[in-house]
A protein has these predicted regions:
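Cytochrome P450 core scaffold surrounding the K-helix E-X-X-R motif
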Residues: 41-48
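NAD(P)H-binding Rossmann-fold N-terminus in SDR/SDR-like oxidoreductases
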Residues: 152
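Exposed loop/turn and edge beta-strand positions of beta-sandwich/beta-sheet ligand-binding modules
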Residues: 16, 28, 64, 103, ...
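Residues forming the Rossmann-fold NAD(P)(H) cofactor-binding site
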Residues: 155
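Glycine-rich beta-strand-centered segment in the early N-terminal region that forms part
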Residues: 21-38, 50-93
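NAD(P)H dinucleotide-binding glycine-rich loop of Rossmann-like/cofactor-binding domains
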Residues: 45, 79, 85-149
Length: 156
């Protein structure tokens, strides 16, 4: 499959479109044919070497979020079916024609939401959720004052 990789860190000029092996899902994983991905700050930091690839591959496939169509499901996956439209987040490897992720890392794309729009949702919304609910302890019925809602996270 084709993927955008970096073999050295730097600006956009280090991005290379190349052939890499197709990923193979494990029993609890899904294989998604990526229709769209998004570019966010973490991607640019990873490209520059300031946000290392946690999987430590010989080449880094960038991209933290995706939207696409389910192509294969692992043997123990019951929540998804081939053909489902999903969006999700992964620790890299989304700038590729296919991505493998744990079944819990994917969300269904609501009817009426285009794949291109869905690709820009996971990273920023999960970042906002983590900040407000996980880190900040926000619960139902409580309020939070957000002084600045800038960048992609501000859209959430």
């Amino acid at each position: 499959m084709r993927a955008v990789v970096v073999t050295e860190y730097g600006g956009p000029e280090v991005l290379t479109l190349t052939e890499v092996p197709d990923p193979v899902p494990g029993p609890d994983e899904i294989l998604v044919r990526v229709a769209h991905t998004a570019v966010n700050r973490a991607d640019t930091l990873q490209r520059a070497g300031g946000y290392p690839d946690p999987q430590r591959r010989e080449h880094e496939i960038l991209g933290l979020e995706f939207a696409g169509t389910m192509e294969t499901v692992g043997a123990r996956v019951t929540a998804w079916q081939v053909g489902d439209r999903v969006m999700g987040i992964e620790a890299g490897a989304c700038y590729a024609e296919r991505v493998v992720t744990h079944e819990r890392q994917a969300l269904p794309i609501p009817d009426g939401v285009e794949l291109a729009d869905a690709a820009a949702i996971p990273e920023v919304f999960l970042t906002a959720w983590d900040a407000l609910v996980v880190q900040g302890g926000l619960t139902s019925g409580r309020w939070a004052l957000v002084h600045a809602g800038a960048s992609g996270v501000g859209t959430a």
